[in-house]
UniProtKB/Swiss-Prot annotation:
Name used for this protein in its record: Tetraacyldisaccharide 4'-kinase
Gene: lpxK
Job of this protein: Transfers the gamma-phosphate of ATP to the 4'-position of a tetraacyldisaccharide 1-phosphate intermediate (termed DS-1-P) to form tetraacyldisaccharide 1,4'-bis-phosphate (lipid IVA).
Organism superkingdom: Bacteria
Cystine pairs: none
Source organism per UniProt: Burkholderia ambifaria (strain MC40-6)
GO MF assignments: ATP binding; tetraacyldisaccharide 4'-kinase activity
Length: 342
C-alpha cells in the first residue's frame, strides 16, 4: 500500500481529474474504451438474450451499484435501504464482494469481524444494521449461503454488483455523486463501467454542491448528512461537529471520493486541513503522528480498520446518514411485493 499522499494517491487523483474532461489522454485511450465497451456489451447481451441464465436465489434481490468507478455513496445508501426495508416489514440480508479482504468462499460478517477478513464496507454495514451480511467474490454463492444460514431473510440487498449479472435481481438502483458520468467515456478513457443509458429501476444522485438533479427518468436526490462525531477510543463520547469549528482539525479519508467527505464537513461549518488517502487504505501504521492538530476527523469506513492497538486520542469518527426519498422507498417496496407503484 502506498504511503499517504504517495505515488498511488497522486496517480488516483490525476486519473480522477482526467476522467472529468475530454483531454488528450482521454482521447488517446478511446480505442481501449471501445474494446472494453464491446466486451461489456457482449456480456450484458449474453444474459439479456438468454444465452446465459442468471441464478434465482429464491428471494427478491435489490442491487445498489454504480456505473462509474469510485465511491458514490453506495454504503450509506445500503444501510439506509436495509433500515427502510425492515421498517416496511421485510427481513433483509446483505451480500457483498468483500473488496480488500482475503475471501474466497462465502463468509459471514459480524460486528466482531476484522476488516482484513471481511472488507471495510461489509463490516461497517454489519455494525450499523445488525443484519446478516455475507461476503464472497461470487455473490450468488454468498446469497445462497446467507439464505441457508438465515432462512427467515426474505429480501437480499447486494452492496455493489450491478455488473454481476449472474445474480438475478428484482430491483436495480444506481448511485451517482456530483461527478455523474464524468467525461462520458468508458474505461479506461473515462470513469464509466457501462454507458449512462444503461437501464435501471431508479437513479440516486448525491450532489452536496448544487443539489441539482440530471434530467433522467426516475431520478431521486440522495442526501448524505453527517452526525455527531464519536471518539475512536470511547465511542460513547460524542461531540457535535460545530464544537470543532475553533480547533485545528485535519480531515482524512481513505474512500473512493474523499472530497465528498471534506465537502460534507465544510457544509457543516468546518474549515479543516484535508488529506486524501488511497481508497481502502490499510492503516498499517499511524499516518498522523507528525500532524500538529487538535482533532482528526475520519470516516466510519476507515474507522472499522483501526483496531484496539490504536491510541491516538485525537481521532474522531464522523458517521454519515443517507436520507432516502419516500417515493423511492415506495417504488422499491412495491416492486418487491410484485405490484406497480401507485
Amino acid at each position: 500500500m502506498s504511503a499517504p499522499g504517495g505515488p498511488l494517491a497522486r496517480l488516483e487523483a490525476r486519473v480522477t481529474r482526467e476522467w472529468q474532461r475530454r483531454g488528450a489522454l482521454a482521447w488517446a485511450l478511446t480505442p481501449f474504451a471501445c474494446v472494453f465497451g464491446l466486451c461489456a456489451a457482449l456480456r450484458r447481451t449474453a444474459y439479456a438474450q438468454g444465452w446465459k441464465q442468471p441464478v434465482d436465489v429464491g428471494v427478491p434481490v435489490v442491487v445498489v451499484g454504480n456505473v462509474t468507478v469510485g465511491g458514490t455513496g453506495k454504503t450509506p445508501t445500503v444501510i439506509a435501504l436495509v433500515d427502510a426495508l425492515r421498517a416496511a416489514g421485510f427481513t433483509p440480508g446483505v451480500v457483498s464482494r468483500g473488496y480488500g479482504a482475503n475471501v474466497k468462499t462465502p463468509t459471514a460478517v459480524t460486528p466482531a469481524s476484522r476488516a482484513s477478513a471481511a472488507g471495510d464496507e461489509p463490516l461497517l454495514i454489519a455494525r450499523r444494521t445488525d443484519a446478516p451480511v455475507w461476503v464472497c467474490p461470487d455473490r450468488v454463492a454468498a446469497a445462497q449461503a446467507l439464505r441457508a444460514a438465515h432462512p427467515d431473510v426474505d429480501v437480499i440487498v447486494s452492496d455493489d454488483g450491478l455488473q454481476h449479472y449472474r445474480l438475478a435481481r428484482t430491483v436495480e438502483l444506481v448511485v451517482f455523486d456530483h461527478r455523474l458520468g464524468g467525461n462520458g467515456f468508458l474505461l479506461p478513457a473515462g470513469p464509466l463501467r457501462e454507458p449512462l443509458s444503461r437501464h435501471r429501476d431508479a437513479t440516486l444522485v448525491n450532489d452536496p454542491y448544487s443539489g441539482a438533479l440530471p434530467p433522467w427518468p426516475d431520478t431521486y436526490a440522495l442526501a448524505l448528512t453527517p452526525g455527531a462525531a464519536w471518539h475512536l477510543d470511547q465511542p460513547a463520547l460524542r461531540r457535535p461537529l460545530s464544537q470543532f469549528a475553533h480547533e485545528r482539525v485535519l480531515a482524512a479519508a481513505g474512500i473512493g471520493a474523499p472530497e465528498r467527505f471534506f465537502a460534507t464537513l465544510r457544509a457543516a461549518g468546518l474549515a479543516p486541513a484535508t488529506r486524501a488517502l488511497p481508497d481502502h487504505y490499510a492503516f498499517a501504521d499511524n499516518p498522523f503522528v507528525d500532524d500538529a492538530v487538535d482533532a482528526i476527523l475520519i470516516t466510519e469506513k476507515d474507522a472499522v480498520k483501526l483496531g484496539a492497538s490504536w491510541r491516538d486520542a485525537r481521532l474522531w469518527v464522523v458517521p454519515v446518514e443517507a436520507a432516502l426519498d419516500p417515493r423511492l422507498i415506495a417504488l422499491v417496496v412495491e416492486k418487491l411485493r410484485g405490484r406497480s407503484p401507485a
